[in-house]
């Protein structure tokens, strides 16, 4: 076993040499550029692109630094911090949830804010834009490390300092985000004392009795180098899909997850639909030094190496990855500018008079007075007389001659101006940042600002690629870290926060335990980035635009009140909280804005329910109206009854007439006249009865119509 670990360690050391050797010169240039821009005196270090070391050639000159490259570099960094790049998740297929995507957005913002996300990204962007290479990492920490029963974790974003010396990727990885890397190193150094205290090992043993097959020296006098070694392994995993025949819902689990949920899935109607063996990416991390393993390999959440590179400019030339920051091409011009300023300053500080020419005997023992004349500025300078061997004065102490003062080099001044222009041209120094006259057209100003933005676009675009990769790595880790049913804090885009659940749960019937069915396990979520002004800047711009729009609206415009509410909702100020809360309730009531949390959803539902319930006066008015309608219907029914009775009476009369006709036909002639007279009287009586019935029906209908009109007028008065 020991021999196997030793061979494994040797393989890891050789991998490090493979990553370090071709990149060593490139990373040294990154460090040199960073020191050149940030460390005092760094602009006199190193050599030019052609290999000349100016510091050695001009040791006796004063060395001034007029840092003309930092202004543009600071502008690029400030532009990034003003226009933050945000990560967004969105559903990638039909099984993904829009609501869960919004929760992921809020949870990522919460992890970014509560950990070192801001510092990690800012530090990586600074390193990338200055030296050419930056990096940050994602890791997991316990939510409550003091509670041994609390196993909850959260994803953290951590900065990596001095990444040009510490982060090394698989040289076979060619993609910008290193998503194709199979392994990587993240180094850090410890003092000998801390190394001994933390790992209970004597650093001296690292150099004794080791037959090394690698080149890098992991121990240097008082410093011990150790590294986290990340490696991606592709392991065979059985993936099982279950489907509900009734709902056609499908869920997928790895084979090692089935023990927890298999019986519950069967109880709720899921049956196994398909099974497949796939290669699953899993990441392992171990800690190594120059002798062996300090910590054995352990699996970490996610499927990707959690190291996120950030580049300034990047190329592959001669199969070597080459990077540089914004100032790399301006370093020679800056060195020349500093040299010219130093030479002019040296010339200006020298004695402008002629230098006396004297013999050695005239200056003997008096050198210090003459050497320090520009520094001490004495009232007079001593000089020895010329004497013979007997000590007699031959000549007075008079200089033999004088040197001619060197005139100011006009070409030097012109060259100094040209060098400054060269620095501005190479760095793309923004003229838009200089004061402008007030009479310049708005289109011209926008054109200058756009041209200025182009010089920093490549750095912001590369940072967007890096943050997109960070979102992919975070999502891969979140599927495991936030897989249990627990409340998590999410942060909305406007900075407000809420509590949300990332999963649903079912009960294990055998153990009684609650088993989480993670919503994140189903569906694909795409990661995008949004490059633009911060939420505060966009909100202020919205207020400005809407205020101008409001000024052009008529007072009676129905949209004016809505516009005023939106402006107030986007405003910030002291003492506006209660007023804004009232205003938002009004906007929610009108349906102008959507609820953004559970409390507002409940409030909107309550308002809708109240709107559906009529008030007492309306109910009373509706009751009167219904009563009137009932009376009208009653009158119609009575009219129909009268008509039916009249029809029945007429029918009976016709039957009686028919019977009379039959009797008349069978009677003799003497009685026929009497029968006819009786029929005539009967017909007259039926007619009078029918007329009386119709008159009674009309009176009833008129009375009913009058009562209905009175009830309707009463209902209108109630509603008013």
From Swiss-Prot:
Pfam families: P22_portal (PF16510). One of its GO terms (cellular component) is viral capsid. GO terms for biological process: symbiont genome ejection through host cell envelope, short tail mechanism. Its main location: virion. It is found in: Virion. Keywords: Capsid protein, Late protein, Viral capsid assembly, Viral genome ejection through host cell envelope, Viral genome packaging, Viral penetration into host cytoplasm, Viral release from host cell, Viral short tail ejection system, Virion, Virus entry into host cell. Homododecamer. Belongs to the p22likevirus portal protein family. Forms the portal vertex of the capsid. This portal plays critical roles in head assembly, genome packaging, neck/tail attachment, and genome ejection. Procapsid assembly may initiate with a nucleation complex composed of portal and scaffolding proteins. The portal protein multimerizes as a single ring-shaped homododecamer arranged around a central channel. This is Portal protein. The lineage of its organism: Viruses, Duplodnaviria, Heunggongvirae, Uroviricota, Caudoviricetes.
